[in-house]
Amino acid sequence: MCSVRPAHAVIDLDALRHNYRFARRLGGGKALAVVKADAYGHGAVRCAQALEAEVDGFAVACIEEALELRQAGIQAPILLLEGFFEVEELELIAKHNLWTVIASSWQVRALAAFHSPSPIGVWLKLDSGMHRLGLEPKEFRDAWMSLHSLPQVGEVVLMTHLARADELDNPRTNEQASVFAHASQGMVAPASVCNSSGLLGWAGLYSDWGRPGLMLYGVNPISQESTSLSGPLRPVMMVYSKLIAVRELPAGEPVGYGASFVTERPTRVGVVAMGYADGYPYFAVNGTPLLVDGRVCPLIGRVSMDMLTVDLTDHPQADVGSQVQLWGVQPGVAELAAHCNLSAYQLLCGLKRVRRYYLGEMGAV
């Protein structure tokens, strides 16, 4: 049997389903499972297959991601969060029964000129203050009325996106909610306001549809982590590797590139088969926690392309072959991100060269 490099990720699909149920229960309505960017690095097809029996729908960034799911046999509704970029995409949207965000007047006109064999579900997006995609408030009502008059348009959902909902003491979220409420006043249509931060931190903004993304994967995006609602979330991704070498160094010896760490005492140094080419953050600082055979040990030295080093001095039982957890339950991905001045989104989406295993299955994707 061929040996393989030990760096790998384990994806807990039961935890994924648990988190989706929690998000839907929390919002009190329906919930789109956001599986864009390959399900935040977890594997979009396999995650969608795990959720399809109970999901209200999926959300992806673009049509390429939607077609990947359709080609894998996913039949549940799929929303294109960025809408369509070219008029020609409407043929594929209709053919594959996709929903699309409408975020500009030209898209309304394009849809009006398109003859669809069946009605297309539309999510009409208001720019309430994020200032990325979305119609201006003064355009919103006219767009809604135009879409309602078109036979090629099915149900229209009104939506907006919160920019600072991860900051619980910031007034911007309530300001955006007020803009959305004013712009949609009198429109009889389902609404969608809350992303993960909105669901976890802003109960007063719950509406017909939630859009859980990061929380699906067990991470609370709220920066203060002051909400008690993060407790029920279960981490979905656990990233592991092994010690491939152990060295004994005297005091005063530099470790790794640039000598960013110098031993202050006789030190056992473990070498782990995981580096920034795998997706472990290059900017992880000395002291960043790792779990070696279930015991917390600090990162020492600069992370290199294929390896990193850990202080095993206080863990004499650890040796070559010992299991190392880079993130998962402890440390959590949010904790690791904080040590690196990064976001959990970046870490999850940045895994490379790492095999994925799904609990209950032996095959890597």
From Swiss-Prot:
Pathway the protein acts in: Amino-acid biosynthesis; D-alanine biosynthesis; D-alanine from L-alanine: step 1/1
Highest taxon of source: Bacteria
Reaction equations catalysed: L-alanine = D-alanine
Residue numbers of N6-(pyridoxal phosphate)lysine PTMs: 36
Pfam families, sorted: Ala_racemase_C, Ala_racemase_N
GO molecular function: alanine racemase activity; pyridoxal phosphate binding
Active site residues according to the UniProt entry: 36 (proton acceptor), 257 (proton acceptor)
GO biological process, one term: D-alanine biosynthetic process
Binding-site positions, substrate: 132, 305
Keywords tagged on the record: Isomerase, Pyridoxal phosphate
EC number(s) recorded for this UniProt protein: 5.1.1.1
Keyword Chaperone listed: no
Cofactor: pyridoxal 5'-phosphate
Broad enzyme group: isomerase
Gene Ontology, cellular component aspect: cytosol
Family statement: Belongs to the alanine racemase family.
Function, as annotated: Catalyzes the interconversion of L-alanine and D-alanine. May also act on other amino acids.
Listed name of the protein: Alanine racemase
